[in-house]
Amino acid sequence: MAKNLSAIKRIKTSERNRLINRKYKSVVKTLTKRCLMNIENLENSNLNDVQLSISQVYSKIDKAIKKGAFHPNTGARKKARLARIFAYAQKQQN
């Protein structure tokens, strides 16, 4: 265990940040899974629901990037993959 006061503070701070980052990552994973389930069950009637869920995932990813839980490239990659899956599902439906 650290004896230096600044080191003790850094341990507390890093633990707090770890928990916050974990929360952001968990929310993004959960919303992404929900969105992928909506995309799998894509029909003309629930196209708006799918687009709404995608926008919610995008919003949470952007917030996670802003707070530092995700690197900007990681967020961009997650959004691009989601968009590619959605576009492919739309193409298969038509």
UniProtKB/Swiss-Prot annotation:
It is found in: Plastid, Chloroplast. One of its GO terms (molecular function) is structural constituent of ribosome. The keyword Ribonucleoprotein applies. SUPFAM superfamilies: Ribosomal protein S20. GO terms for biological process: translation. Keywords: Chloroplast, Plastid, Ribonucleoprotein, Ribosomal protein, RNA-binding, rRNA-binding. One of its GO terms (cellular component) is chloroplast. It holds the Pfam family Ribosomal_S20p. It comes from the Eukaryota. The keyword Ribosomal protein applies. Its main location: plastid. NCBIfam families: S20 (TIGR00029). Binds directly to 16S ribosomal RNA. HAMAP family: Ribosomal_bS20 (MF_00500). Belongs to the bacterial ribosomal protein bS20 family. This is Small ribosomal subunit protein bS20c. The gene is rps20.
